[in-house]
Amino acid sequence: MFGFMTMNQTPIRLEDLLENVDKPLPDITRPVWRFHDNFNDLLDFWLRRHGTFRALLSDLSAAVEDFGADGPDVAEEERLMEMWSLFREQLAQHQQVEDGVYFPVVVALHPEFESAFDALFEDHGAIDACLDAVENAEDGAGMMEALLLLNDKLLGHMEAEEDLIMPLVLETPPPLEFVVYDEDGNEVGGDDVLEDEDEDDSLTYVTKN
């Protein structure tokens, strides 16, 4: 059923991202991220977004597993579809911001790691294939199998992504920040506007660094 995903369904690891990178990552490990002098609201927001996707995936898996346990239920099916639509839409928008805003900024600051970000970009495409497999599943069992693949793929991706990006950004003084402009070139805010990162396609994000 999932033959078209075989090549990319393996969760990516930090070691995979760094395969063609000669420069070592800064030695800033996960336990100290939030205590680092350069940790700021933007980084907190980005990590919390990943936390939201982890929670949504868990809720979706539980909902699919329980679906139909007490017989057909139209309301239950509608709730499940709403959960899935919300998850897929928010994830797609989040990845667009990463690919179009976050990643280019970090690559510009650390060009030695460009190949690692190319791998992350490609892995976003592999995640899309996993999402399609969930939607194209023929029955509940197939959907659950596809969700498990998606779960492993996305969790691995976010962990590797965080372990790559956080040390690079935390090493970058001053703390990484963004100025946000509307389509007329007017400054409309800073990192706080990223709370609504997916609300308005007309906004332009420019790093202060």
Residue ranges and their predicted role:
Residues M1-N209:
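Small-residue-biased structural context
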